Regions:
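Short, charged low-complexity linear segments at domain edges
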Residues: 1-25
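Conserved Radical SAM active-site core
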Residues: 5-8, 24-25, 35, 39-129
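Solvent-exposed, flexible loop/coil residues
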Residues: 18, 52-55, 141, 268
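Short, glycine/acidic-enriched capping/hinge loops at junctions between secondary-structure elements
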Residues: 18-21, 38-41, 268
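Conserved AdoMet/S-adenosylmethionine-binding subsite of the radical SAM
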Residues: 85-270
């Protein structure tokens, strides 16, 4: 794992998704991701942290400065990109935050769940309050031959690229470890259409098998699985909301919206 921590966004807003939706939060976004997501013609909503990685703009001192300026904000969200590419760096950051805000912080790590904790990164289990896991399903990979323009660059999904992404996009063992040992977690899925439910059921079945066979653990997913409508505009979200809610009611899962898009649109830094 890489030890540096390329922070490219640093801002205070509200959490727009998941169990902590509505909480004032300090967002720390790192650059770099091991996946390249593509949903029904739209791509990752932060391509500057995945498709075309920006260089680091901030350091830990900048994070602490914003904390000093906003002592009322206790939720800290470490997002990306994929933060678990930088486990040692994330741990160093959390230690610094804890020194500045002892016992007054709530740490969320947003991850795609495809990278296992290793080495000193395993200590993150001690510090992270909420693991926000967004597993990438079959509907997150572009069809072979797709070409898209992203931030001035042409990205082509060749057969080799698609195969590699499909191999990397899920890590059942890594997710299962968080389910068992993490303080709290949420499995947050982007809802595209009815096929999404089939894919989720398949993934949950794989996780249940590992939990049963390796940990003798029977999970209650209903209080942890969340559906979120696909979209990066209010119009796109609205077109998926009712179907997503209906599926949540059928399955006993939770629904989460994307409040930041409803309020600010797909603007960076909100």
């Amino acid at each position: 794992m890489k030890n540096n921590l390329p922070i490219i966004d640093l801002f205070v807003s509200i959490q727009g998704e998941g169990k902590r939706a509505g909480h004032p939060s300090l967002f720390i976004r790192v650059s770099g991701c091991n996946l390249r997501c593509y949903f029904s013609g739209s791509i990752c909503d932060t391509p500057y942290s995945s498709y075309n990685n920006e260089k680091s703009k901030f350091d830990i001192a900048d994070v602490l400065s914003i904390i000093d300026d906003n002592p009322q904000v206790e939720d800290i969200v470490i997002t990306g990109g994929e933060p678990l590419l930088y486990q040692a760096g994330v741990l160093e950051l959390i230690h610094a935050i804890d020194d500045r805000l002892p016992n007054k912080h709530y740490i969320t790590i947003e991850t795609n769940g495809s990278i296992a904790l290793e080495g000193e990164g395993c200590d993150l289990m001690t510090w992270v309050d909420l693991w926000s896991i967004s597993p990438k399903l079959q509907n997150s990979i572009a069809p072979v031959g797709t070409k898209i323009e992203v931030l001035g660059k042409t990205v082509e999904f060749t057969e080799d690229v698609v195969n590699r992404l499909n191999e990397k996009r899920k890590n059942i063992d890594a997710i299962s470890e968080i389910v068992v040992y993490g303080r709290d977690y949420q499995l947050k899925f982007v809802y595209s259409d009815e096929n999404t439910i089939t894919y989720i059921d398949e993934l949950l079945g794989e996780i249940r098998t590992v939990l049963h066979d390796e940990y003798k653990y029977v999970p209650d997913f209903n209080s942890h699985v969340m559906l979120m409508p696909e979209g990066i505009t209010e119009e796109q979200l609205q077109s998926k909301r009712q179907s997503a809610v209906n599926e949540c009611i059928k399955k006993g899962w939770m629904y989460t919206d994307r409040l930041h898009i409803t309020i600010w649109g797909d603007k960076r830094g909100y």
